[in-house]
Structures are given as C-alpha cells and as structure tokens.
C-alpha cells in the first residue's frame, strides 16, 4: 500500500473548504519546466484546473448528512486521489456518464451555492474537463 505524504482536516464554510483543498494540493505539487529558446514555461505537474474541478466535485457530490462518510484527498508521489463515498446517479456507470454527462447533485443547495458563488458551472462537465485538461 502506498503511503500518502500529508493529511489535514478542514472545518470551515463551503468556499473556505474549497480554497483549503486547493491550497493543500498545490502545497504538494511540483513545478515542471520546459525551456524553449529563451522562454521558460513552468507549470504544476497537475494543472490547477484539474485540482479545481476535482475539488468542486468532491464538495458538490459529498454525502453531507453523514460525518462517517467524509470525502478525502490523498497525495502520493505519483498521483492525487480525490475519494468521495458518494455514488454515481442511479442507473449511471462512469462509462455511461463520460458518454452522456449531466448534472445530478446529491444536494442541490450546495450545487446552487457553488454555482451562484461563481465557482461551478452546473452542467455536469467537471469530470470530462478533468480528462481534457
């Protein structure tokens, strides 16, 4: 079993949780550089957009009514795992979802707050965006 590098517990409002998750991930990311002529292009090994989308999905689709079912983020040397005890909508497999994405949040008020707060788009394309970034 792989060992993760660090852990933290975040107890804050929804938007502060989002920021804390993103900051936690960035804290452990490495910069990779590409030098082309005189231009140096440095970027995180995992793009910021991927971290944002995965963090939003983690919070939006969390099972909020059970403290025993807490989502988590584990950072390993070769990957980041965003784990949520929630499930895909009834009758939808991950493969089906990739073919026909749609938004079906467990808690519409949480999804609405993130949408109205300008951090989520509400179309159900977050996972697809992760694969294309």
Can you say where each PLM-predicted feature lies in the sequence?
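Conserved beta-strand-loop-beta-strand hairpin that lines the nucleotide-binding pocket
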Residues: 1-19, 46-133
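Helix-hairpin-helix/helix-loop-helix acidic hairpins
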Residues: 9-40
């Amino acid at each position: 079993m792989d060992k993760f590098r660090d852990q933290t517990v975040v107890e804050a409002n929804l938007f502060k949780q989002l920021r804390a998750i993103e900051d936690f991930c960035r804290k452990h990311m490495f910069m990779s550089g590409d030098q082309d002529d005189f231009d140096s292009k440095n970027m995180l090994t995992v793009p910021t957009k991927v971290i944002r989308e995965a963090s939003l999905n983690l919070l939006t689709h969390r099972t909020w009514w059970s403290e025993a079912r807490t989502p988590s983020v584990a950072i390993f040397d070769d990957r980041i795992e965003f784990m949520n005890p929630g499930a895909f909508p009834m009758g939808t497999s991950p493969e089906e979802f990739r073919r026909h994405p749609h938004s079906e949040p467990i808690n519409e008020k949480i999804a609405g707050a993130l949408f109205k707060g300008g951090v989520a788009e509400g179309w159900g394309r977050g996972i697809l965006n992760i694969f294309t970034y």
